[in-house]
A protein has these predicted regions:
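A short, N-terminal "cap"/entry segment at the start of jelly-roll beta-barrel domains
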Residues: 1-72, 164-177
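Double-stranded beta-helix
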Residues: 2-12, 110, 135-177
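Conserved short histidine dyad/triad with adjacent acidic residue
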Residues: 56-63, 74-91, 130
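Short histidine-centered beta-strand/loop micro-motifs
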Residues: 63-69, 86-91, 108, 117-118, ...
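His/acidic/aromatic-lined binding-pocket segments of jelly-roll/cupin-type domains
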Residues: 77-78, 88-89, 94-99, 118, ...
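Glycine- and acidic-residue-biased ligand/ion/polar-headgroup-sensing regions
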Residues: 82, 93-95, 99-105, 109-110
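Histidine-centered metal-chelating micro-motifs
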Residues: 84-87, 105, 126, 130-135
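Short acidic-glycine-tyrosine-enriched beta hairpin
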Residues: 110-130
Length: 177
């Protein structure tokens, strides 16, 4: 007989294993590519598709019925075509980019505009600390799949460094209503 050495979360107490397995498994084949996941995603140069697995990530789409309920982090897979990326931004928690396929140029930046960039390949990552301006660009000739994790179950939407994008950072959520 097995012994659980830690208590289940309150919402799982009494839940049969079959229901837990059904609720907490996510499959890529069941995830629709969301090309409007972020406020900047319709702007040329920032087009990308989010596949939400655990929580909504920085998209703010926390009511997505297809996600695994988040606890203390989120996990998404983002598809980035050549020439695309995301706008410089911050989060209130750390954000991790883990490249699964392709090559991705990631950057960190300070308020003076100084930017440092490095290229990540498959099975390489960067952890962007809270409050540090960061982002990525696919400057290669092939698509990229990158796993993105945020260190909070329901993080705020992206804190864009650009004032105009920041003012509209929730606009994509209102358009979906």
């Amino acid at each position: 007989m097995s012994v659980a050495r830690h208590q289940r979360s309150p919402e799982l107490v009494g839940m049969p294993l079959e229901e837990i397995l059904e609720k907490y498994v996510g499959r890529f084949r069941d995830k629709a590519a969301d090309w409007a996941a972020f406020a900047d995603a319709k702007i040329e140069g920032y087009r990308r598709a989010q596949h939400r697995f655990i929580g909504a990530g920085g998209s703010g789409k926390h009511d997505d019925p297809t996600i695994i309920p988040p606890g203390n982090f989120t996990l998404s897979i983002v598809y980035v075509e050549p020439g695309q990326g995301n706008a410089a931004h911050t989060h209130e928690v750390e954000e991790n980019f883990f490249v699964l396929q392709g090559f991705l140029d990631v950057f960190i930046e300070d308020e003076s505009g100084k930017r440092l960039t490095t290229r990540l390949g498959p099975w390489e990552c960067i952890c962007c600390p809270a409050g540090v301006i960061h982002g990525y660009q696919n400057d290669s000739l092939a698509p990229v799949y990158v796993q993105i994790m945020l260190g909070r179950g329901k993080p705020e939407t992206m804190g864009y460094a650009d004032d105009k994008l920041y003012e509209r950072r929730d606009q994509h959520l209102k358009a979906a209503e």
